[in-house]
From Swiss-Prot:
GO terms for biological process: pyridoxine biosynthetic process. It comes from Paraburkholderia phytofirmans (strain DSM 17436 / LMG 22146 / PsJN) (Burkholderia phytofirmans). Pathway: Cofactor metabolism; pyridoxal 5'-phosphate salvage; pyridoxal 5'-phosphate from pyridoxamine 5'-phosphate: step 1/1; Cofactor metabolism; pyridoxal 5'-phosphate salvage; pyridoxal 5'-phosphate from pyridoxine 5'-phosphate: step 1/1. This is Pyridoxine/pyridoxamine 5'-phosphate oxidase. It catalyses: pyridoxamine 5'-phosphate + O2 + H2O = pyridoxal 5'-phosphate + H2O2 + NH4(+); pyridoxine 5'-phosphate + O2 = pyridoxal 5'-phosphate + H2O2. Belongs to the pyridoxamine 5'-phosphate oxidase family.
């Protein structure tokens, strides 16, 4: 087995300075996200979502970002899943985007609110039919006896709703309302650039600070 201690990479693709970034972190995120798209990175919209349960035990998983604006970062899921239960108990979370090909990370922290039913309905209607049926078929994070049980449920839902399944009441969107957003750019010798946007509330101006790597 390869020695884990020997696996390392020196970062040298870019730099990050306060003078060069947008004062608005959402616009700065949009710039970096578009650069990730233009670089044809595989699934640049993937992010790690970290949540914490009522006992303080963390969990993390990869989800897809589905919207970003001045209100926050939006994703959709099953409200009865593990992450849904944890967000109900502790409505704070962290997101992490990692674009390794660009030697960049973006970390977002803040409180979680549900999107409106109208927003959830609109996004659900835009999904492929198979995904809409799957939202009904899967009791996400619950134990099942076999794969065939899931596939049987999928067929039953397909017969029940045809090509017009409604949005399940237990499925919808969340919006992370940021309190802090960090932009990280890899640099040589592990002396990375880290710029942190913070604000005291949603109506305050963003402040930018540099963090030691």
């Amino acid at each position: 087995m390869t020695s884990l201690a020997e696996l390392r990479k020196n970062y040298s693709l870019g730099s990050l300075d306060v003078a060069d970034i947008d004062r608005n972190p959402f616009r700065q995120f949009d710039t970096w996200f578009q650069q990730a798209v233009d670089a044809k990175l595989p699934e640049p919209n993937t992010m790690t979502l970290a949540t914490v349960d009522s006992r303080g035990r963390p969990s993390a998983r990869i989800v897809l970002i589905k919207g970003v604006d001045e209100r926050g970062f939006v994703f959709f899921t099953n409200y009865e899943s593990r992450k849904g239960r944890e967000l109900a108990a502790n409505p704070y979370a962290s997101l992490l985007f990692y674009w390794i090909e660009l030697e960049r990370q973006v970390r977002v922290e803040g409180r979680i609110v549900k999107t409106s039913a109208e927003e959830s309905d609109a996004y659900f209607a835009s999904r492929p039919l198979g995904s809409r049926i799957g939202a009904w078929a899967s009791n996400q994070s619950q134990l099942i006896e076999s794969r065939s049980q899931l596939e049987t449920r999928e067929r039953e839902i397909s017969l029940q709703y045809g090509d017009q399944p409604p949005r399940p009441p237990h499925w919808g969107g969340y919006r992370l309302v940021p309190e802090a957003i960090e932009f990280w750019q890899g640099r040589p010798s592990r002396l990375h650039d880290r710029l942190l946007y913070t604000r005291s509330d949603e109506h305050s101006d963003w402040q930018i600070s540099r963090l030691s790597p």
